[in-house]
Amino acid sequence: MELKKYEELLISNIKALMSVDSPSGFTHNATELVKKMVTDLGYKCTQNNLGNVVVEVEGEDDTAPLGMSAHLDTLGLMVRSIKPNGDLAFTVVGSPVTPSLDGEYCRIYTREGKVYEGTVISETPAKHVFKDANTHPREAENMVIRLDEVVRSKEDVVKLGIAAGDFVCYDPKTTFTSSGFLKSRFIDDKACAGIFITLLTIFKELGIKPKHKTYLCFSVHEEIGYGGATLPKDMKELLVVDMGCIGDDLNCRETDVSICAKDSSGPYDYDMTTMLVELSKKHNLPYVTDIYPMYSSDAIAAWRAGHDVRCALIGPGVAASHGMERTHIQGLMATVELILHYIQ
């Protein structure tokens, strides 16, 4: 299947999604963007009460609908309190690798619609002042947000309209290299959401019609555990498209599409997983099968919510997950191709 001409489109779609802040609980701007991108391509979509966006793609048969899920929500931070000197204490949204946040530029969104800039730093950031500047723990309770405003006290910050509960979003720093690497935060899972948007174009331009009615689902609470809980109830199968794990004794690299046999919640559907392996072999895709030791997905949330659905999990290999992540266009396009073979 010749798909190389869609690489630039995929890159463009990923960049567009990365440009919009969307930590779990603060995804409205991202869902509005996705709805516009989808409708501009001529598709209809719906959005449920919790915010998931679902695109229904007509199939040759509508008696056994398939679902595919990628999540729009990302990791983030939230203001916990204002310190006496005007720095902000924060709590994490999801599970970022907090030491990797030291020095990150960020935006603070107030409930009145104001946006302020700042930097995530250690409590002891100055090498010329603090003996433990190098060794001070980099956890949420040992770090602060330094506002880029002239503030000297808690009262100064309150006057700006900043309060506990305000979302804090840090820069993804999205970069595509000439060698094909995507370096960015939030590749998990905006890269796969970008794959879904690209698939909709491929369906149109190549005249591809899925064998079964297919729901493309953009979930918005995956990073906090219940993204898949409110996906369509009539799905017979759910293919979760999320990042593949890299590291330790795992097989995956950034250039692969990873097929997950089991994560920390248990095995995925045996028959679906076997079919995905066989499709990868048949079409000579760069694939691996792996066990993800500390991982959960929209499939687990769907099962725990009582969905009677078979589930499998695939995705491009992503290094340094929940930190400064990296994948490769080869792994991304292999994921695209495996999905296309799966739905047909």
Residue ranges and their predicted role:
Residues 1-344:
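N-terminal hydrophobic/helix-forming segments and targeting peptides
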